[in-house]
Swiss-Prot record:
Zn(2+) binds at residues 91, 94, 111, 115. Residues 1-85, 606-669, 685-706 are annotated as: Disordered. The lineage of its organism: Eukaryota, Metazoa, Chordata, Craniata, Vertebrata. This is Lethal(3)malignant brain tumor-like protein 2. Keywords: Chromatin regulator, Isopeptide bond, Metal-binding, Nucleus, Phosphoprotein, Repeat, Transcription, Transcription regulation, Ubl conjugation, Zinc, Zinc-finger. One of its GO terms (cellular component) is nucleus. Residues 15-26 have a biased composition (Acidic residues). There is a cross-link at residues 406, 648, 660, 676, 701 (Glycyl lysine isopeptide (Lys-Gly) (interchain with G-Cter in SUMO2)). InterPro entries: Mbt, MBT_L3MBTL2_rpt1, MBT_L3MBTL2_rpt2, PcG_chromatin_remod_factors, Znf_FCS, Znf_FCS_sf. There is a cross-link at residue 701 (Glycyl lysine isopeptide (Lys-Gly) (interchain with G-Cter in SUMO1)).
Length: 706
């Protein structure tokens, strides 16, 4: 039978390479089932990973791989970083980008001692392997698994990752145990999820249009009594983000055994995977007697059908690699005073989201954001553009914190999302001009605002008119190309309620009268970035969204309104006053199943049952705010998130509430836990079409009753 497209012959050296892999896996304390992932990738996966650095170079030359910060530089690139005079460098072992002066050894080839030793160890293994194969030794031995190792780490963490962050937030499988059942939620209410292709910052967004209804996959058979893991073919009935509703072949129109699955898991494979990896196809016990000729049945069902690309999981893992590493330093907005930045260190990277620790703060003084967030900048950005920064020395008591012990370089500018270039000729924003802007302290409001200061590189300091601060501490920095600022009368033209300055009524506010009274002028409409892509979002679509007032939380949410490229996000179970405006390309919204894919804790909708009224003192204590300003939220007692500063008090209240609660929850009750996090990497992957694969059915095995 013809071999499926994209499958290569296994190199003759594969047994020896597998032995080397087994040696490496001893790092995980003898975790045997990880080997199943290696075999599941197939022989073509092994050779792909071991030669990925060469293949990636060829693909980039052919224009097939997107440019990423890691691909912008090579170890010998003699370019200087922005105004710093330091040469950039790339670690030859892990690929991390940094400054040459901060790298290890005289040659500056590695970012740390561990990378240098790993490179040396792998080179020796490669040299020994070459001699055993009768090949002459070379001056520079090829490093075994150089590119594959991070992929294996990613797959291992994805399939078996457990644990907690320092703040107690569960990760990996620990987080999924506390997870939310998207499948039941969508099916019970007939909700529609936003497609993955709407989110440009998530894994494989540019290939998800190939995932369609009727597609065939090979999936783990959970209705079998055999001692080993067996598989069966299933059809995609419905797609919802990364999750799909599957039905085993043979059930035909019977939906009673349909089940939801995340396509990012390692138990879903393209047709032909079982044949390549000598896995057994066994029909579910429920229907095993329905047909006597399963081979013939599958031949009819599979001919001409579509399936996943052969390298689907390889590309998934590759797209979940991120350039930021623990210990990198950067500048981030000060959450206690948004008009300035502070120095911070990357503590954790999960799915492209960064947990940052302020250098002059406590161990729990953190800030969450995506690596493409406009709130973070390379070291030196504030000084260069004229933005305020808090100058303080690093706390001596933080010197022993694990993250601060790993500081080895500043995050280089190439790692940050680039802003649009601006041209100031022919008129530009001026100090005192009026406009409309999303209130950074209350993201559900679009307010009348003023340009307080014009910075360099197109950045503007904006303040909301009528704000409580008179010292400029509530000014906020927006770039001129930001989609959070709008020309005057934008809200009126799009039927959005504008929040007027203090002393004005929304229904009587007039821009003309206000400009005349304040003797100011409106910023010209031509200066604003009003481009609107065909983003694909529609009212009612479900997604996972960051609560920007408490950015460590990702919640179940709904697109409430679409105004050009502006989305009004409603958090399910919360009042409308907590809705937030975000851009359609915001890195703070994710497709259904993203948290499950990355191991981040998803916050379910708030329970709707009535709660006991809070005492005034308790209510005051439970209020929480984002940047220490206006925004306040009082979640119900059962679902409020744990805060580091009041763990003891909250724990006592939770124990009292648990004592009064019934021993078992109602069947349809949703129990929410306000914690969360994530794990892994992300980037964009090259586009691959879903091939029509031949039908490998020789290995179908009939299951018999014991």
């Amino acid at each position: 039978m013809e071999k499926p497209r994209g499958v290569e012959e296994t190199p003759s050296s594969e047994p020896m390479e597998e032995e080397e892999e087994d040696d490496d896996l001893e790092l995980f304390g003898g975790y045997d089932s990880f080997r199943s992932y290696n075999s599941s990738a197939g022989s073509e996966s092994s050779s792909y990973l071991e030669e990925s650095s060469e293949a990636e170079h060829e693909d980039r030359e052919a224009g097939e791989l997107p440019t990423s910060p890691l691909h912008l530089l090579s170890p010998g690139t003699p370019r200087s970083l922005d105004g710093s005079g330091s040469e950039p460098a790339v670690c030859e072992m892990c690929g991390i980008v940094g400054t040459r002066e901060a790298f290890f050894s005289k040659t500056k080839r590695f970012c740390s001692v561990s990378c240098s030793r790993s490179y040396s160890s792998n080179s020796k293994k490669a040299s020994i392997l070459a001699r055993l194969q009768g090949k002459p030794p070379t001056k520079k031995a090829k490093v075994l698994h150089k590119a594959a190792w991070s992929a294996k780490i990613g797959a291992f963490l994805h399939s078996q990752g457990t644990g907690q962050l320092a703040d107690g937030t569960p990760t990996g499988q620990d987080a999924l145990v506390l997870g939310f059942d998207w499948g039941k939620f969508l099916k019970d209410h007939s909700y529609k999820a936003a497609p993955v292709s709407c989110f440009k910052h998530v894994p494989l967004y540019d290939q998800w249009e190939d995932v369609m209804k009727g597609m065939k996959v090979e999936v783990l058979n959970s209705d079998a009594v055999l001692p080993s893991r067996v598989y069966w073919i299933a059809s995609v009935i419905q797609a919802a983000g990364y999750r799909v509703l599957l039905r085993y072949e043979g059930f035909e129109n019977d939906a009673s055994h349909d089940f939801w699955c995340n396509l990012g898991t390692v138990d879903v494979h393209p047709i032909g995977w079982c044949a390549i990896n000598s896995k057994i196809l066994v029909p579910p016990r429920t229907i095993h007697a329905k047909f006597t000729d399963w081979k013939g049945y599958l031949m009819k069902r599979l001919v001409g059908s579509r399936t996943l690309p052969v390298d689907f999981h390889i590309k998934m893992v590759e797209s979940m690699k991120y350039p930021f590493r623990q210990g990198m330093r950067l500048e981030v907005v000060d959450k206690s005073q948004v008009s300035r930045t502070r120095m911070a260190v990357v503590d954790t990277v999960i799915g492209g989201r960064l947990r940052l620790l302020y250098e002059d703060g406590d161990s729990d003084d953190d800030f969450w954001c995506h690596m493409w967030s406009p709130l973070i900048h390379p070291v030196g950005w504030s000084r260069r553009v004229g933005h305020g920064i808090k100058l303080s020395e690093r706390r001596s008591d933080m010197a022993h914190h694990p993250t601060f012990r790993k500081i080895y370089c500043d995050a280089v500018p190439y790692l940050f999302k680039k802003v649009r270039a601006v041209y100031t000729e022919g008129g530009w924003f001026e100090e005192g001009m009026k406009l409309e802007a999303i209130d950074p302290l209350n993201l559900g409001n679009i307010c009348v605002a003023t340009i307080c200061k014009v910075l360099l590189d197109g950045y503007l300091m904006i303040c909301v008119d009528g704000g409580p601060s008179t010292d400029g501490s509530d000014w906020f920095c927006y770039h001129a190309s930001s989609h959070a600022i709008f020309p005057a009368n934008f809200c009126q033209k799009n039927d959005i309620e504008l929040t007027p300055p203090k002393g004005y009524e929304a229904h009587t506010f007039s821009w003309e009268a206000y400009l005349e009274k304040t003797k100011a002028k409106a910023a010209p409409s031509r200066l604003f970035n009003m481009d609107c892509p065909n983003h694909g979002f529609k009212v009612g679509m479900k997604l996972e969204a960051v609560d920007l007032m408490e950015p460590r939380l990702i919640c179940v949410a709904t697109v409430k309104r679409v105004v050009h490229r502006l989305l009004s996000i409603h958090f399910d179970g919360w009042d409308s006053e907590y809705d937030q405006w975000v851009d359609c390309e915001s890195p703070d919204i994710y497709p259904v199943g993203w948290c499950e894919l990355t191991g981040y804790q998803l916050q379910p909708p708030v329970a709707t049952e009535p709660t006991t009224p809070l005492k005034a003192k308790e209510a005051t204590k439970k209020k929480k705010k984002q940047f220490g300003k206006k925004r306040k939220r009082i979640p119900p007692a059962k679902t409020r998130p744990l805060r580091q500063g009041s763990k003891k008090a909250l724990l006592e209240e939770d124990l009292q509430a648990a004592a009064k609660a019934p021993s078992e929850p109602a069947p349809d009750e949703i129990i929410t836990v306000r914690v969360k996090e994530e794990h892994l990497d992300v980037a964009t992957a090259d586009k691959a079409l879903s091939p029509e694969l031949p039908v490998p059915v020789e290995n179908i095995k009939q299951e018999t009753d014991d």
